[in-house]
Amino acid sequence: MLASRRGFAIAGTTGSALAMLAACSNSHGRGDTQPSASALPSNQQEGAPCPADMGHLEQILAIGSGHKLPEGADVASVTPAVEYTKHNPRGWGYIIAFTATDPAIRQYVTDNTSFSGETIDRNPNSKPGDIQLSDLNFDEISRPWRAGFSDGALVLERPLGRGWLIINGSSR
């Protein structure tokens, strides 16, 4: 009889201890939410294929088709298109700021747009307003020129030297 009481006491103590452990390990009630284990880095937008940073530049340029930079371009920054996503909540985007020589930019325009690189100086200035361009401050770009793509835009400063390649997408 003593053995059965001892077994009962051990079983009861073990059960109580397990119940307490379970309660402690689940400190969140039913209504609480726990942070997602797959939280995105601050430089990656929801639905975007990769973070917006220099380390992922090649992956970003490979999105869609035909994205590249002028020959010999130096990339100054790669940032997420934050303002664009305010206008298009399911969208994501990248802003690639670069510098390149005048001849390289002209050749790039001729090869990658429907415009001639030789005539872009005569084209009118672009104006803000398109949601694809909402991340750029046009007050800081002299004589901006723009060419649109199906999934982005190219904005150049004149005289030529600085540019921004914008790549946009949607998680739909």
Predicted regions: what is each one?
Residues 95, 105-172:
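Extracytosolic low-complexity repeat regions of secreted or lipid-anchored proteins
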Residues 25-27:
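Bacterial signal peptide processing site
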Residues 1-4:
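N-terminal secretory signal peptides that target proteins for export/translocation
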Residues 8-9:
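N-terminal export leaders
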Residues 30-96, 100-101:
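Extracytoplasmic low-complexity, Pro/Thr/Ser/Ala/Gly-rich segments
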Residues 20-23:
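C-terminal motif of bacterial Sec signal peptides marking the signal peptidase cleavage site
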